[in-house]
Regions:
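N-terminal secretory signal peptides that target proteins for export/translocation
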Residues: 1-5
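Sec/Tat signal peptide C-region and signal peptidase I cleavage site
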Residues: 22-27
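Signature for phosphate-centric chemistry
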Residues: 28-114, 118-327, 331-446
Length: 446
């Protein structure tokens, strides 16, 4: 081993040791093993805090009180959400700069840090905010998205093809099979949460929404509906409660006054989490049911594997020059849930529910090189600001980090080295998890 390599490894190990000593115990992130160095990270980031996707007119139809207004259009990242993602970007620089992956105190080498975002305003502005937080004085950082805005980006929103038909009726049937053929069990299991939600949406026994609909969709029969592209959603009390609960979470993260968060009818975060358990259940059904996860997540997961093998495989990246070392893929909670389902992943950040894809949260795939053997390994981690950090707009640092959790990869349990999965094993797991017919050329090859 050359003196330069030995020096680099020693420096990286020293930084990792310092980081481990400075990072609070609750962070639960493993240090870089001695003799290893981090080589690449692919970070699948959810967009930050946004306004409700539905209009107030649509939401008001099913609530007894008009919903509060946001300073942006429906579905847009709010200014507060943008600020919070800049704070997260600052922490990414501290985290990955401290590990020696990227520059910590200067602009990155051209091409080594890049972001690819979905087409929505909330994803594009999230990507820009993260990069601005990482390197506020650096210009021309690669922030790209698909040039054609008239069709969905197949990385984040794959569309039906001959080899991946995404049949709506089949997806409906798969969801109903997980429900045991009817909603009876689900409605029974979530009866207390639905009653709680009904008291928030429709206090004093209100039966009509201000927009004229059935308050809380209480009188609407539960059903699974699918669109022409195979997307499924739930109608009825569970579906509307899921939407409402996530909107309450966004209100709280936005720092709205307590009398505006769920109209002041939720006293504690524990109550909010009770309501969010409905949202988690609905997301599990609509995003984690196996055929749906394979249809929606195979392209993205294959792309992650391709980027780890070759940093030039990052979307929009030139075939010449430096490979990407830190690549941000900015999408949606559905993308994270799809990948979590394919790899059987779970995590829990303090204050959130297990496996919650929180606003601005990220699932990271981190690749390490064992310098002495030349072998490569992959670890997974989840990073997210806690709800309290978002409400306080808390600056993030080694001493005051966001929530973070090492994420186990069950399929690699027998092959782990230093709690990391050998790259070749990880790639085999990815290939076994995806549906080949749902992987397009845009996902790269390895």
């Amino acid at each position: 081993m050359s003196l330069r390599v030995r020096t680099a490894v020693f420096a990286a190990s020293l930084v990792a040791s310092v980081v481990a000593m400075m990072t609070p115990v609750h962070a639960q992130i493993l240090p870089t093993p001695p003799g290893w160095q981090i080589e690449r990270a692919v970070v699948l980031n959810r967009h930050g805090v946004r306004a409700p996707i539905a209009t107030n007119e649509q939401l008001d139809r099913y609530s007894a009180t008009a919903w509060p207004t946001w300073p942006v259009e429906p579905g847009f990242l709010s200014p507060r959400g943008e600020e919070l993602m800049r704070l997260m970007g600052t922490y990414y620089r501290v985290l990955y700069g401290g590990r020696g992956l990227i520059q910590a105190d200067d602009c990155p080498t051209a091409g080594t840090v890049a972001a690819w975002t979905d087409l929505d305003q909330r994803t594009r502005v999230t990507g820009a905010a993260i990069l601005a937080g990482m390197y506020p004085r650096c210009a021309n950082l690669p922030l790209r998205n698909q040039a054609n805005f008239t069709v969905p980006d197949p990385i984040f929103h794959p569309q039906p093809t001959a080899s991946c038909p995404m049949n709506g009726a089949a997806n409906q049937a798969a969801v109903m099979a997980r429900l045991g053929g009817s909603f009876a069990s689900a409605l029974r299991n979530y009866a207390s949460q639905l009653t709680m939600m009904q008291s928030v949406l429709c206090p004093a026994g209100a039966t009509k929404g201000v927009g004229g609909g059935s308050c809380g969709e209480a009188g609407v029969a539960s059903s699974v509906v699918a669109d022409a592209d195979g997307w499924v959603r739930l109608r009825g009390p569970l579906g509307y409660a899921s939407t409402a609960a996530e909107n309450f979470l966004m209100q709280s993260a936005e720092g709205m006054p307590k009398d505006q968060v769920a109209w002041g009818r939720i006293a504690h975060d524990a109550t909010l989490n009770e309501l969010l358990s409905i949202h988690q259940f609905v997301q599990d059904l609509t995003q984690k049911t196996k055929p749906i996860a394979q249809q929606r997540g195979s392209n993205l997961l294959s792309l992650v594997g391709a980027i780890l093998v070759n940093g030039h495989s990052f979307p929009g990246h030139a075939a010449t020059g430096q490979p990407v070392r830190l690549g941000l893929l900015v999408g949606h909670q559905s993308n994270i849930h799809n990948i979590a389902a394919l790899l059987d992943l779970t995590w829990q950040i303090p204050g959130y529910l297990p496996a919650e894809a929180s606003p601005g949260g990220a699932l990271a795939f981190e690749q390490f090189l064992d310098v002495s053997t030349g072998r490569r390994y992959v670890r997974l981690a989840y990073y997210a600001q806690t709800l309290d950090e978002m409400r306080r707009r808390a600056p993030l640092s080694y001493r005051d980090p966001p929530g973070m959790k090492q994420v186990a990869l069950p399929a690699c349990a027998a092959d782990l080295v230093n709690d990391a999965c050998p790259l070749e094993s990880f790639l085999k797991i990815v290939k076994a998890a995806v549906e080949p017919g749902c992987v397009t050329s845009s996902a790269g090859n390895y």
